[in-house]
Design a protein with these regions (language model features):
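PRPP-dependent phosphoribosyltransferase catalytic core
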Residues: 2-31, 156-232
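Active-site-facing substrate-recognition patch
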Residues: 2-84
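Conserved hydrophobic/aromatic pocket- or pore-lining residues that grip, position, or stack substrates
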Residues: 48, 90, 112
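Short glycine-rich phosphate-binding loop at a beta-alpha junction
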Residues: 84-94, 169-170
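Conserved acidic residues
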Residues: 88, 136, 166
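Portal/gating segments that form or line small-molecule/metal binding sites
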Residues: 98
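Short, glycine/charge-rich flexible loops or terminal/linker lids adjacent to PRPP-binding catalytic cores
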Residues: 101-139, 147-153
Length: 232
């Protein structure tokens, strides 16, 4: 068997793994009612964007079987796409990323720290809690990414403290805002995730989680999110 055939088969296997993980993540979000489509008033993100949909990954911590499955898939993604040997410390972003970072660090047998949004304002004035050796290679873990803006502060804090970071793992990536990858890309950080809203809406439509009229609204938003406003 030639090297070319072998490399193609490995790539295909990885794509199958990604598709399985995306479908599992989408199904869990819908089954746990962590994926929302608005009824009366659209959702507003911290960036000021309006959206007919919202994902709440924080709810997943209350579902033991679901979170175990997702952590297994997250570790599979990390080891496949980043490499265990490329990570010295797992860092959770305050606050939603902390629990997921802890579970991932435990599964991978790695130290963990968490990064505050701002220095705590007293004592050591620390923004990073835990032990992070100078030059350590960190993986930032967060629950989700919309436009990537909130990750910038965490990345800067890690680097200012002497850490090295080139990857960020999220459970969910909206997948519709180019800035989410370009902003981090400009900082030399690659974004990894299990699923996007495209995966969720396909699963929702296939299994009847959302009625047809809501599916249409979501697809309109996903195709043109900038400046979206509700009709009527």
């Amino acid at each position: 068997m030639s090297d070319d055939v072998y490399s193609i088969s490995v790539a295909q296997a990885h794509e199958i793994e990604r598709a399985v993980a995306a479908r599992a993540m989408a199904h869990i979000l819908l089954e746990t009612k962590s994926a929302y489509c608005y009824d009366d008033e659209p959702f507003t993100f911290t960036s000021g964007r309006r959206s007919p949909v919202y994902i709440d990954c924080r709810q997943l911590i209350s579902f033991p079987r679901a979170r175990r499955k997702l952590m297994d898939l997250a570790v599979q993604t990390i080891e496949r796409d980043i490499g265990h040997e490329s990570i010295d410390v797992v860092a959770g972003g305050e606050t939603a990323g902390i629990a997921f970072a802890a579970w991932i660090a435990e599964r991978m047998g790695l130290p963990m720290v968490y990064v505050r949004k701002q220095p705590k304002g007293f004592g050591r004035m620390a923004q990073i809690e835990g032990i992070m050796p100078e030059g350590a290679r960190l993986l930032l873990v967060e629950d989700l990414a919309t436009d990537g803006g909130s990750k910038v502060n965490f990345i800067n804090a890690i680097r200012q403290a002497g850490g090295v970071i080139s990857d960020c793992m999220v459970l969910f990536h909206y997948g519709i805002f180019p800035a989410s990858t370009s902003t981090l890309g400009e900082m030399g950080v690659k974004l990894h995730g299990l699923a996007t809203w495209w995966d969720v809406i396909e699963e929702a439509e296939a299994r009847g989680y959302f009625p047809p009229e809501k599916v249409a609204v979501v697809r309109d938003f996903l195709n043109a999110p900038d400046g979206w406003t509700p009709k009527g």
